[in-house]
Every structure is written in structure tokens, then in C-alpha cells.
Regions:
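N-terminal Rossmann-like dinucleotide-binding module
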Residues: 1-44
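Beta-loop-alpha module in the N-terminal Rossmann-like domain of NAD(P)-dependent dehydrogenases
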Residues: 15, 40, 48-84
Length: 84
């Protein structure tokens, strides 16, 4: 299974860590506009790959599911993009 986590701040990293703890075979693909957060998630082993945009991640990785871990006011826009 391939899981897309949109937002690699504290909540996104927590979800990635918990997911890996449940099943290390689940591939985590992260999305964050901040390069530092993408690098940190990969360096900590929390993301197998990380992208700057949802479109890039979906095109390259074809995830099976997604978690939205961004600021609450952005949830509707992120979910809309994921559904497209």
C-alpha cells in the first residue's frame, strides 16, 4: 500500500511515524511546499519519497490513500485537488 501524506509538519510526521509503527511495509509519500520539511521526513525515514506538490506526487506515485495533515483552513482545497 502507498499512502500519501499531505503536510509534513508535526501532524504529518506524527501520522507517518504511527503508520510505520503499525506496518513498516506501507510506503509513505509526503507532500510539503517546504523543502526542509521534505528533506527532514526523508532523512528521519518517515517518507520514502517527498514532493513539493500533490500533482507531482500523484502522477509519480499513484497512491492508494491520502491523509490531509495541513492547516484546517486548507483542508477543503487539498481534498478537492486529491479528488480531481
Amino acid at each position: 500500500m502507498k499512502l500519501l501524506i499531505v503536510g509534513l509538519g508535526s501532524m504529518g510526521k506524527r501520522r507517518a511515524r504511527l503508520t510505520k509503527g503499525i506496518d513498516d511495509a506501507i510506503q509513505i509519500v509526503g507532500v510539503d511546499t517546504a523543502e526542509g520539511r521534505r528533506d527532514e521526513a526523508k532523512n528521519l525515514g518517515l517518507a520514502d519519497a517527498a514532493y513539493a506538490t500533490i500533482a507531482e506526487a500523484v502522477a509519480a506515485e499513484h497512491p492508494d490513500a491520502a491523509l490531509v495533515c495541513t492547516a484546517p483552513l486548507s483542508h477543503a482545497a487539498v481534498i478537492g485537488e486529491l479528488l480531481d
